[in-house]
Structures are given as C-alpha cells and as structure tokens.
Amino acid sequence: MERFLKQFWWKIIGIGLLMFAIVSGLWIPLYYGVAGLSFPNLPILNESIRNLLFHVPMWFSMVFLLLLSFIYSISYLGTPDRMRDNYAVGFAQVGVLFGALGIFTGMVWAKSTWGAFWTNDPKLNGAAIGMLIYFAYLILRSSVEDEMKRGKLAASYNIFAFIMYIAFIFVIPRLTDSLHPGNGGNPAFSSYDLDNTLRMFFYPATLGWIALSMWISSIWIRYNFLTQEYEEYED
C-alpha cells in the first residue's frame, strides 16, 4: 500500500476523471443539448440530480476508506506495528471527513426534494449513528497514552465499528420503509433516475472521488507519521 500511495499516475488519472465528471456534469443541460447529451429532467429532482456526482461518490469513497481502515485494524491485531496503526487511523479519519461531506450534500439534496434538511428516515439516522460510532473511535484513541495498548484497543473497536456501520447504512434501512433510494423497496440507480448519459459522468466521478480520498489519506497518514517521529526526536 505504501508503495502504491507514493506513485503519481493514479492521482493524475483520478483528478482528470473528477474534473471531467464535475465540469462536464454541471454543464450538461436537462433538455436536449449538445451532441444529444442531456440529464433526466425528473419531477421534484430537477437540477438537484447533479448532486448525484457529489453525494453518492463521497459516500462510496467513505465506505472504501473505512473498509481499508477495517482491513488494517485486522492486520494490526495479527502483526502490531506503528505503520499499520497509522494506516488504520488515517483512513478512518479521512473516511469520517468524507462521511461528513456526504451527510452535508445529502442534507442539501433532502431540502430540495423532501422539503427538509433531515427526516426521521432509517438511512439518515443510521448514517448519523455510524458517524457517532467513528467519532467515539477517534476519541478513544486520544484517551489512551500507551502506544501498544492504544493500537490494540483501537483496532478491536474499529473492527466492531465498521461492522456496525455497514449494518446501520446498508442492512437495517433495507428492512424498513425509507425515502432514500435503494431502501425499503425504493430502487436506486434504476433507468428512471440514472440514464446512459448520467452514467457517463457518474462512474468517472466515483472513481475520481475515490482517488482524491486516497490521495488525501496518503498525505494525512504521512503527516501523522512524521509528527510522531518529530515528537520522539524532541523527547
């Protein structure tokens, strides 16, 4: 992972895909446009459908980062070392950042389509509870001074946190009625709200946001590692 994060090619490709998706996606009209390209002009959604290029890819990026954090926590319990712990917490911290951005863009979208920034919806409530679980993970890490004890305790909690988060945002909402697409019988990514033109920009946007989240994570992980090295050098 460390060798991959230091490589530059995937960062250029990711930023290129992201710029293509966002700039072009914001330019494509909701009616017959240049070269026949247009986004679905649906009732209620209207122009807010462009938020699909932000809200959903941010959540995909969050889940991807939290999955990596989960994997590194398992790896740390098997072979404890500082770098594995740094990867676990670094991916989790940036994952929480993208989760917060996902919630913010979702609230803006909800206000436009549902008439309120927040509703008593199992998907939304599950996302909020999941974020609180990860905030508790970060607080737990800062409350333990011994490095080895902190690493093992945090890794164990992180494994629990990821499993619970997946249950809160993917499993439980599917078992109940929900306004959110993809839950409670409300389909997501159907031909009704995701046509071929929108797919041309949605998939590159998803890959671009994931690449950006990985790039930010690599910088943050490196910063944390250098900070630890500097503090030990001063001591």
Give the ranges of each region predicted by the language model.
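Polytopic transmembrane helical bundles with strong interfacial aromatic enrichment
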Residues: 1-235
